[in-house]
Amino acid sequence: MHNVNILTIHKEPNYGAVLQAYALYKTIENLGHVPYIINLDMDYSRFPYSLKYRVLLGLHKWMKGYSHCFALAERFSRKHCPNQIGNFHTTAELESYPWNKDDYYLIGSDQVWNLGITQNLRTAFCFSFLKNDVKNRYAYAASFGNIKDEERRKSELDMKALSLFKRIAVREKFGVEFLQRNGIDAVEVI
């Protein structure tokens, strides 16, 4: 039995994000391991538009509903994925946590490498905050989303950290090809 620390997008106002996190958590648990969600709070995504933009477009009513959806997602996550580590907001906070080098670390299964979603936390989703002696790094059904700009991906993702993964499975064929062109072995999963 191993501790499996999962870094994913798990409490966004999006049923797909919430349910994929729950499904992965339960699958790890059903395989006889102890899952933990790394609780990385992506604050910026709660208010993706400037106040001026929201007011001009009348989005203030929309934002009330949006905030309610966040609360529901967080409540679901706490109830159905109770093992959660920390309340991190930055890569620096993740770096200062005493991660166990013998645990397993799993990224996925969502658009964790979509630069438009992960924004200032994009390197965290490559496990850049783990020390090099952590050997059990995996990615399952990680997605680049629709970001097909290879130069942007190469410059903004932590390719060195990705090269330390034992196994990587991604959703897109272009993602497999991108990783392989950069010396990182990957397979496609659906």
Predicted regions span which residues?
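Alpha-helix N-cap/helix-start capping motif
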Residues: 22, 172-173
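Conserved dinucleotide-binding and phosphotransfer motif residues
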Residues: 31, 164, 182
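A short beta-strand/loop micro-motif in the catalytic core of glycosyltransferases
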Residues: 165-172
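Helix-loop-beta element that forms the nucleotide-linked donor phosphate-binding surface
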Residues: 176-190
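An acidic- and aromatic-residue-enriched active-site/binding cleft used to recognize and process polar
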Residues: 9, 40, 173-174, 184
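Aromatic- and Gly/Pro-rich donor/ligand-binding loops
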Residues: 4-15, 19-160
